[in-house]
């Protein structure tokens, strides 16, 4: 497992630099190399490949320490306007991006740090112990209910009092809808403690209630869950291709292509929220047959490379 985590982590970092960067920009000259979530997950896998040799309680402690403690770094970052240099930026600093020049025409952009993802990945590794054969479904459901409810409750309480866990406090707005939006507007890049509790809490509750779910909808969800990275790569290129088509249909010319950091994305270009959701649903439906095929292919073939995609 350690070797697999190490090599897959390195593979993800390489893919982020070469394949995913191209998927975001369609720039064969690679004038900007984008380091986002996949590189952060890759670095986290590399770190986990060493941590798994430690005793399980130590691994669990490290995971919780990172998850619960990484927002302590928010204060020095805010006091220095997020300008603490390369190391700090690739480890934790949220918001904006850090530019690392390679030469006069090529740069690496670090959009957010890996630390919080490392904590989540460590706890995910520990979470897998609940799926051992020695743990019954009934036991697992009780534990998941307790964890999920505790996470949701912690989010509501800490967020309500604007306590620890997110650098963006909520505030009362001019109407109820905007106040609710402010309450749930937490930091995703990288995921804050509040974002993690808000998303993983309900997800764990979902696992508690729907482990025995069967039928077409269950197969639909499981298919994407079994080939998540394959879906990620496909959806990135498909959405960017659709963006390129929409760009020219909207009447933009070549002079608007080189908007930075993403090509074919001039500042005023876009659609209303309902259209964004419609496109999102359409992309999922379009990619489902392809993901279904790849899932079946992986299930019937044992080539080592398939475990890396």
What residue ranges belong to the model's regions?
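Alpha-helical transmembrane segments and their immediate juxtamembrane cytosolic regions
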Residues: 1-309
